[in-house]
Swiss-Prot record:
It comes from Homo sapiens (Human). This is G antigen 10. The gene is GAGE10. Pfam families: GAGE. Residues 1-116 are annotated as: Disordered. Residues 71-80, 102-116 have a biased composition (Basic and acidic residues). Coiled coil: none annotated. This gene belongs to a multigene family expressed in a large variety of tumors whereas in normal tissues, expression is restricted to germ cells. These genes organized in clustered repeats, have a high degree of predicted sequence identity, but differ by scattered single nucleotide substitution. Their sequences contain either the antigenic peptide YYWPRPRRY or YRPRPRRY which is recognized by cytotoxic T-cells. Residues 31-44 have a biased composition (Acidic residues). Belongs to the GAGE family. InterPro entries: GAGE, GAGE_fam.
């Protein structure tokens, strides 16, 4: 079997994106007001300023809670209707072995072979 015809692949033209203008060297002093969060007053609870490790532990607890004991395998079993092409997909298919290649009838060129 040989493939004939032209490929339909056409590369897209490259788009040129202009680099951002250089403003100058970035100094940390310029961002000192924006980087540090405002400190809460004495009467307000410090909900924004939490220890990152404590926040991460809280996330891990939620993930581990979902990984509890696994349900039985029977409850996860899904029923799929047979389409006639599942050779060896169940208890009936385990009894079937591979056919002897000498006994297999080869389809002629004009005949169509059923495909799943």
């Amino acid at each position: 079997m040989s493939w004939r015809g032209r490929s339909t692949y056409r590369p897209r033209p490259r788009r040129y994106v202009e680099p951002p203008e250089m403003i100058g060297p970035m100094l940390p002093e310029q961002f000192s007001d924006e980087v540090e969060p405002a400190t809460p007053e004495e009467g307000e609870p410090a909900t924004q300023r939490q220890d990152p490790a404590a926040a991460q532990e809280g996330e891990d607890e939620g993930a581990s809670a979902g990984q509890g004991p696994k349900p039985e395998a029977d409850s996860q079993e899904q029923v799929h209707p047979k389409t006639g092409c599942e050779c060896g997909d169940g208890p009936d298919g385990q009894e079937m072995g591979l056919p002897n290649p000498e006994e297999v009838k080869r389809p002629e060129e004009g005949e169509k072979q059923s495909q799943c």
